[in-house]
């Protein structure tokens, strides 16, 4: 399958998102000045979801989804599940940051965890959206959906 310009941009965007998420995970996990487990977890989740979106696009380019539509349903479910988890995390970190009167500029504050939870929400939504679109594209092959 030929890679269109839009698909190439989606591949590059997902790859950059995975790199940014994993770099946030390692920064807030390993650097003593920035050590904040909540931000590391939210950044790591963002990186994993971006990687799943990248894998979704790569499998689309390789035409793998045509024979495994149930996998797209699974990716859609995972995207919805992590969207809900990201919203809960965003609200929780926002409430914690407000009740503890944390500074917006502090790298250890829960406000950064809110930002990374929102980015995780974005990647979970995009994972669901791409899985839904690719599933609709291959829905005409309903005979193979039992595999």
From Swiss-Prot:
Matches recorded under InterPro entries: HRG
In which compartments does the protein localize?
A: Endosome membrane; Lysosome membrane; Cytoplasmic vesicle, Phagosome membrane
**Per the UniProt entry, what are the Gene Ontology biological process annotations, in alphabetical order?**
heme transport
- Pfam families associated with the record: HRG
Q: Which reaction does it catalyse?
A: heme b(in) = heme b(out)
From the UniProt record, which GO molecular function terms apply? heme binding; heme transmembrane transporter activity
Q: Which UniProt keywords apply?
A: Cytoplasmic vesicle, Endosome, Lysosome, Membrane, Transmembrane, Transmembrane helix, Transport
Intervals of motif Di-leucine motif: 143-144
Q: Which residues cross the membrane?
A: 11-31, 41-61, 74-94, 111-131
What is this entry's stated membrane topology? Multi-pass membrane protein
One Gene Ontology cellular component annotation held by this UniProt entry: endosome membrane
- What PANTHER family has UniProt attached to this entry? HEME TRANSPORTER HRG1
Q: What does this protein do?
A: Heme transporter that regulates intracellular heme availability through the endosomal or lysosomal compartment. In macrophages of the reticuloendothelial system, is the heme transporter for heme-iron recycling. Essential for macrophage iron homeostasis, transports heme from the phagolysosome to the cytoplasm during erythrophagocytosis (EP).
Q: Which family does it belong to?
A: Belongs to the HRG family.
Q: What is this protein called?
A: Heme transporter HRG1
